[in-house]
């Protein structure tokens, strides 16, 4: 011990030399990532605006069947769904993570009813999409913020798992559907997958023996503060720069494959709708979307059957699959259960996915709302 200071002597530096600070390099996936997006919390939902402005007459009587959506204000797919359902007199209500702090909400545990604002409703179909706890506008480093996040996390998970409500994309399955589990499942149904390593030392990993890319094991977007989203996009692995450096958290190192083209396939129920995507690098979809070429294409029947098998395996109703066409093979990359389709439709000048989703939700709602089920005591 250093008697003067009461601390261990610095054994790593010679006497009289200054201690050198340890500088940990920035994680590889945070280097050069310039994508930033501010997610607005502006209310755009058609039905919520109409009901909130008292432009729709209340109907006395039994609780109103509805579609319950857990999302965030910027979820334009759900804004569009709200309008489409209103055209068929189907009530949709939503709980947005970035607008939930002053919500008047009571959820009954012994009967499948909720009081939402001043309305008594009976959810028959629940869809949790972009209800991200990180979007709740509180400071999680404070006791108050941590408390609010914890309560909403518990209740949102329960809402999305209740057995007396039907779910879109069962959360019981999707909450554990990480990228590595996806690769195992895809391989099990006969799809080729890239060789992949999980490591904190990417410079020492070259699955496949050739060029590789580094990918996040988690989400492609970080939200370090509510509403502020930053991208984590795949990047080429340069072993000259990475060397023996250790990452502070595991990443995926994946075999690079020379693809003829990339395919995004949306599966809605038993339908598959495909788009061919042409881009120079993975991040281009976000950082330079106007330069990405998207065209509507038919999906080969053998691929459709494999994707439907995956949806049955993972209990998915609506999902977006990313694949590569390599020679005469399809290579599975990942599935996105919170898939956004309007951008692909806009680039390809079509509305096929929106139409299919709206039709599927209406059909499922009609089946469920007319089913004779017990509500418990009220």
Each PLM stretch: what is its role?
Residues 89, 109-110, 267-271, 326-328:
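Short acidic-glycine loop/turn motifs at beta-strand connectors
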Residues 22, 29-30, 35-40, 44, ...:
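Conserved N-proximal alpha/beta basic substrate-recognition cap immediately N-terminal to
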Residues 67, 212-215, 265-267, 329-343:
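A short beta-strand motif that forms the metal-chelation/ATP-contact edge
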Residues 19-27, 32-40, 298, 312-316, ...:
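C-terminal active-site "lid" helix and adjoining low-complexity regulatory extension at the edge
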